[in-house]
Amino acid sequence: MKKEFLWGGALSNVQAEGGYLEDGKGLNVYDTLVVTPEPTDVATDHYHHWKEDIDYMAEMGFKAYRFSVVWSRIHPLGNEEKPNEKGLDFYDKMVDYLLEKGIEPVVSLVHFDMPDYLLNHYNGFMNKEVIEFYARHVESIVERFKGKVKYYITYNEINLAIHMSDLVSGARLPEGMTKQEMFVHLNVNVQVAHARAVEVIKRVDPQAQVGGMIGHAPFYPLTCKADDILAADFKNKMHNYFVYDTMCNGELPQYFMQYAKNRNIELNMSQEEKDVIKDASKKLDYLAFSYYRSNVISSFEDIKDQNELEDALIFDQRSLKNPYYDANEWGWQIDADGLRYSLVDFYHRYHKPLFIVENGIGIDETMKDGKVYDDERIAYYQKHIKAINTAVEHDGVDLMGYLAWSPIDFLSSHKEIRKRYGFVYVDRDFEDLKELKRYPNHKGKI
């Protein structure tokens, strides 16, 4: 690994902070997401424990830490002209403390935290006005962090915009619109949003590095039948490659435009939007992704119409099992080889530095005798770190860094505390917040 390799961890602040409506923060789409009756307004109280949590990161030898600036803490409604200074001050102090501890901040600019007002009054990124609200939000952050933050990620797991639309893109299916139309329009709009963010970052702080990010899980064909191979190829293109193809080549890929054409869907892109995507592709510094698992997929033998088959594959919810890999209790396949495969695949396709900005395993853990025994997670990390070492040293992949998910416990994207990822155990359960005391796990010593 390079001397400047960015070892560390990553966290979604909206899932950890709490500080529900403190210091001018507004409601966001994660706050209002109703999945479980679990109390989420405190989360794991990172808002009041952030120094303690960063101290643990320093003890573990972190060289980098990725966090997200909660949009609704900076622009409570999302459409304000001026940012909330108390919100900016909170993250500014965090950046300064990280630098004091020798930890490089990596900042995500939207991560499940769009102001709820933009969902309910604009339908999020389905509305092009929201792209400009987002660009204003990005400018507020970069102006404040200029000269201190070197690395930005424009949009967390942008390829999931349609599949977790309320949470990832603040959007719901409009009345009278098909989900295929929403798939096309929303994917185009978030690509424009990413490109606008790149433009703002490079204009405000030309020395900063900016990357685009996907939530990656490679799709393997279930069998060696040609139909299954074609199904996996199509799924990978639309789920994994579309984003990077657009970001790196500066235009929508032919297969995406053909998908729209086959369904008589107008792309509705202005020349200005095409230009900003093209310009951003020339300025993008690296490609980031999360990796937890691989998937398998098969064709649908009973569907003969090609359009229907493609739509079934895009919105497939079958969760087919791979017989060659174990899974955690949520059914996520543990496949370290898939991480090496992904690194080699992306690097040979795009020839840009890569950055693993999330990798970890969710486990239902409890304390025993005041300790958390974490052999299962340690084994997971050992396998995945070995895989990335092979990708770098043997396959020649240019890898910037590896950020584990995650330094501390937090609520999952579905607001569960039971699904834990943290290097540091936070003592609370489903109903009882207890004292939110921190306990370092064995895994903090990996």
Q: What residues fall within each predicted segment?
A:
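Aromatic-lined carbohydrate-binding/catalytic grooves of carbohydrate-active enzymes
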Residues: 60-88, 107-110
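Active-site region of glycoside hydrolase catalytic domains
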Residues: 1-34, 77-79, 88-446
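Short, flexible active-site loop motifs that bind/organize anionic cofactors or intermediates
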Residues: 40, 47, 78-81, 329
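Aromatic- and Gly/Pro-rich amphipathic surface segment
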Residues: 26-55
